Structure formats: C-alpha cells, structure tokens
Amino acid sequence: MIIGIGHDICDQRRVGAIFDRFGIRFSARILTREEQAELQARKNKYAYLAGRFAVKEAVYKALAAADQTEMRWHYAATLSGKNGAPQLILSGACLAGAKTLLPPGHGLKLHISLSDEPPYSSAFVVLSAEQETE
C-alpha cells in the first residue's frame, strides 16, 4: 500500500554554481558524511549533488502527510548499493514521520528512482507499507 509519493527535479547548473561558491560548506550542509565520501569519488560532482538534493526534496514531499516540522537534510541519505542502484536510508524525523503513516502491523518499504539528464537531475520516491509476516 502506498503511503507517500514525492518527485523533484533539480538543475545541475544551479547546484553547481552554489557548490562553486560555497564548496564543502554547501555539501556538508545537505549531505550526510557517507554521501560526502561518495561525492569525493565522483567525476561529475554537480550531477551527484543535484541528484541527492532532488531525492531529499522528493522525500519531504512524500512525507507531507506526516506533518513533521523537524526534518533536516541529513535525515534522508541516498547511497550507492552493491549493484550501483541508489539506496534510500531515512533517519531522525524523516523515519519517525514515515512510521506515523504506517497502519498497524505494517513495515516501511522505500522505493527510489534517480535520473540524470544534463542539465537536470530528477528523483521519484515512493513510501509503501508492507504487511509484516508473523
């Protein structure tokens, strides 16, 4: 059962201009430590930053019904999985908000699609509730 859907698109040029101006101060503000480590290994830093920014915005939109006011950039992380596919990890108020949307006896499942087509990065996030097995 779907409990939240969010989408965002971000201009890599805009994020790149901010990164060029503020550097690590900008990336440290929006990325977790793990995401910052991945950023350092990337050739196209603007696309990476824009994609992660879009994911975080999409997460906040998917959680709109949770009415959380304490969400922070670091509470939604997107890391590369073993096969290179993005893996979404929620913590803090993002995770707490998602759990408030779950019906009794259900667990949280996170789905993410991240696309880069210069100069844009787009992210689509779906939060779903799955029946827990006993």
Region locations from a protein language model:
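Core catalytic alpha/beta fold that binds nucleotide/phospho-ligands
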Residues: 1-134
